[in-house]
């Protein structure tokens, strides 16, 4: 049995199982044996690497991802999957080295520290941005007393206290939260109060409860940053109050895309709380804004004695014109869907259809001892 026939047999086995079990490794032996006979197809190498990862054979998966890069050094797919693999294993230094290779090859990304799965070329890449880059920063900082007063009033109504974690807020990781709790290191606590998010039914304003609690804050945000409000409404970003307890660490991670930037307005900023974006550290100051690109590797640590609270605003990258927001978003969603599809779709030939029809609902069997040159 030659390499192509073995691969087709493996695909047929896989397709018969994958709908019932998306994490199936059916057909793995046939895929491996096919690639041993003919390792020249990078698409086959890519799929085999993914299947080996699901099988828990991580060292072999890594080896095949590296072979994909060697076979297609100007394609970003292998670099991206290897970087995600290394990051999931906590091997961030190695992930940066692979990203550096990708940048030098012109395959994907512009900086080894900036590794989002969806990367739009042509946008300025830098971890930190200056306040002077955003004229609206002064207006937001000018509203700091009113914003903080409304937050403290909320604390009073709900029995929370200014120096402690607001227990009435949603814990990040909860199904009602806007962000992923996986990055909170064990023992930490991260809570949020959503001002604008995809959970709101209105397309242009906050929900009635939020408007009642934060009338001045919402009026300012809707007049000053309508694009950021719209971004939050469609689920690409969010505008929230973000609280991190003392002793909490948010582990290093990269956001999914470089189409947005992040603003933090400091509301409660203890000494010892800090954020690293790329290789550089930053801190917060009450009443002041900081700006960074969260598609860069970043982490947050609160070694202070009290809670750290900021007003967090995601907004479109300033070099992305408004008329391109939706088309860029749609392209990014298509790119992300294609990435997911590559992981579950082995390259197939017409021979696979023949095998599936022949199977008539019965598993396609490939014997482990079958010689490669059998008919």
Name these PLM-found stretches.
Residues 33-34, 67-68, 102:
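Canonical positions in the second alpha-helix
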Residues 267-286:
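A short beta-strand-loop-beta hairpin characteristic of the jelly-roll/cupin
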Residues 261-266, 289-291, 306-322:
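A short hydrophobic beta-strand segment most commonly corresponding to one strand
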Residues 50, 54-56, 70-240, 244-259, ...:
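Fe(II)/2-oxoglutarate oxygenase catalytic core
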């Amino acid at each position: 049995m030659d390499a192509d026939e073995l691969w087709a047999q493996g695909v047929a086995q896989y397709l018969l199982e994958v709908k019932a079990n998306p994490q199936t490794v059916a057909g793995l032996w046939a895929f491996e044996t096919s690639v041993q006979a003919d390792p020249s197809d990078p698409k086959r190498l890519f799929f085999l690497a993914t299947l080996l990862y699901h099988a828990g054979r991580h060292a072999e998966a890594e080896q095949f991802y590296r072979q994909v890069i060697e076979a297609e050094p100007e394609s970003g797919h292998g670099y991206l999957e290897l970087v995600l693999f290394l990051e999931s294993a906590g091997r961030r230094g190695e992930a940066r080295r692979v990203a550096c290779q990708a940048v030098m090859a012109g395959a994907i990304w512009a900086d080894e520290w900036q590794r989002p799965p969806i990367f739009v070329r042509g946008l300025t890449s830098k971890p930190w941005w200056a306040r002077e880059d955003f004229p609206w920063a002064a207006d937001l900082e000018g509203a700091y007393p009113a914003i903080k007063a409304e937050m403290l009033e909320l604390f009073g109504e709900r029995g929370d206290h200014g120096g402690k974690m607001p227990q009435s807020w949603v814990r990040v990781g909860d199904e009602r939260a806007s962000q992923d709790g996986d990055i909170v290191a064990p023992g930490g606590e991260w809570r949020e109060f959503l001002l604008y998010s995809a959970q709101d039914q209105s397309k242009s304003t906050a929900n009635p409860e939020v408007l009642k609690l934060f009338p001045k804050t919402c009026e300012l945000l809707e007049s000053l940053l309508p694009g950021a409000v719209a971004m939050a409404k469609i689920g690409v970003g969010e505008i929230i109050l973000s609280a991190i307890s003392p002793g909490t660490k948010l582990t290093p991670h990269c956001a999914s895309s470089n189409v947005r930037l992040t603003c933090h307005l400091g509301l409660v900023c203890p000494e010892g709380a800090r954020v690293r974006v790329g290789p550089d550290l930053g801190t917060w100051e009450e009443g002041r804004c900081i700006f960074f690109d969260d598609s860069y590797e970043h982490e947050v640590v609160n070694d202070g004695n009290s809670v750290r609270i900021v007003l967090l605003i995601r907004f479109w990258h300033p070099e992305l014109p408004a008329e391109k927001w939706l088309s860029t978003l749609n392209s990014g969603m298509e790119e992300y869907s294609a990435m997911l599809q590559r992981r579950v779709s082995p390259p197939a030939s017409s021979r696979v259809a023949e095998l599936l029809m022949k199977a008539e609902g019965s598993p396609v069997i490939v014997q482990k001892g079958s010689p490669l040159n059998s008919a």
